[in-house]
């Protein structure tokens, strides 16, 4: 990247840790780029000179606001007047904080950030920068954060994420008097100078923040936007449904509008109140603040009246043609023998349908559109069909139900929806949606638009197929960690924050792509890394006893940090003794006389190894060598004392894909490509620290990875922890055996083309 011309010069007093240090202006300059930063000790004020003019600005906040306004593409000052005002409101609040309110304020911010990656919207703004700077510069706030510790996990996550961004790291180094290691100019006699390059917007954990302008939606009026999320209560929400909910909510939030949750309950054969309750639970977990919950069944009488209106206007008719024949006629543009029935005849047949008589159940009500239309969706589609199954809300009041394509535009219009956003699997129905609005003379005409459907390799998002897995017992239920339902994938450890960022990072593009599920978990790792305490687990079946001749003969219990990089997480109890348990797979790679490092303790020398008939190490002896250099050892080993007050046995689980083929094609037999062995588990030893964990707590077993607490032990049932992937899914439970040595097979060397030619010539 070529160096861009500087647009301004920022001069400030660079005395480390000074109360007047312009951290807000420096971070903003780093984010925006193109600012020459000059620090000199003793300057009276912070000043920003605009290159090419005689103008200058003074004051850290004033300079930051100017830089944010000059780079609107970064949205540092929000995306509209409302978000800019909210940013100003936050900045004013942060600036006038009183010390006696610090505790209350931090708890408030933690709750506010529960389901947010940033303070305003979905991008970094000045509000984030100012709050970060206040925390960094006010010692009393830092002390209060340390006191609150794990009780403010969401604020800690937010702060930890910003702390690792390059712009913040460089500014923090300057604040602490450290020399920059990147993009630094040479130190002059009078001070230091650094010129930054023009940079693109900050990346999130998933990549660039998605482009939501791609849909080019008209009529996005502040305070007037009304969207909806219309799930069918025929199963649990999966991540595809989550995308629909999050994108519709994005526009409602961005334009200070509303989102309505509407259950499309038009097929009683598949629907259950259980599904309704769990979908509402999932929507709440996504942090969506909906205006109200409605049901299509609230409008059954109204939709019925529109159907009668169509019959009377001669644009709907009843048809008892068998389904297979009707499909063939539609494919071949052949009109039904009932197409020109009289209005009276159609009303009579529709009445039979409503009574679910023997003749009535053979019929459907069809819209009379255009059987010769090039778009087959217009070839007299069905709009009502019979179903005698009792409805979970209305019981047996109705025997006929509207189809989704007919009911949806009616209810959208009546509920005042302005924008209906749905995945492009419905793209071929968009014109039909608008046509119903026209022929029914509905005044409110929502704008309908499509975005790409989520698709992952080796993952099915079809509710029918997911239901098959549940019904056949392949999985334990809709919340099984192998399923892509929200409740399933969060049991596997995916955080809602990571899921939301992933979906928003995709933007609203209509281009379909199939992704690796591991990409979801890469972003999840960025959320977990700064927030998870560290513990130790040793595989039980292969644990090796290591006896130290000079170790503590009586167990010594010490308080150690749960996470060395974040003391605010508190401490854990660690037992030190002369009898340790080590990972068998680690020990199989150790040689007698080798010096190794016992993590968080020091070095030890292995003197003897005892092996079984298979050649596996079963026990070792050695001695501590704490004066040894941990940097010079090849092996850093996890360990537990076998003399712990409470050695707790836990179950560690991991899962493989259910589907063995990356993408199923039409005609593929589902059972042929179903993995019948996709759940794996081992027992492991841990210590008493595990007894403090609660359901869904997330931790890291050092060197093993992140785990989610799926079951809390009670003396009868064990603790169960599920492995959380941090990238591509490892096959066959391999994640449970991270220390097993894998023999690498050398790849065959292909001779270069010139070598091949020489070989041929020599043969000739």
Swiss-Prot record:
Gene Ontology BP terms: glutamyl-tRNA aminoacylation
Gene3D superfamilies in the record: 1.20.1050.130, HUPs (3.40.50.620), Ribosomal Protein L25, Chain P (2.40.240.10)
Motif ('HIGH' region): 233-242
UniProt KW keywords: Aminoacyl-tRNA synthetase, ATP-binding, Cytoplasm, Ligase, Nucleotide-binding, Protein biosynthesis, RNA-binding
Keyword Cytoplasm: yes
Localisation: Cytoplasm
Alphabetical list of PANTHER family matching this protein: GLUTAMATE--TRNA LIGASE, GLUTAMINE-TRNA LIGASE
HAMAP family named among the record's database cross-references: Glu_tRNA_synth_type2
Function: Catalyzes the attachment of glutamate to tRNA(Glu) in a two-step reaction: glutamate is first activated by ATP to form Glu-AMP and then transferred to the acceptor end of tRNA(Glu).
Protein name according to UniProt: Probable glutamate--tRNA ligase, cytoplasmic
Native organism: Dictyostelium discoideum
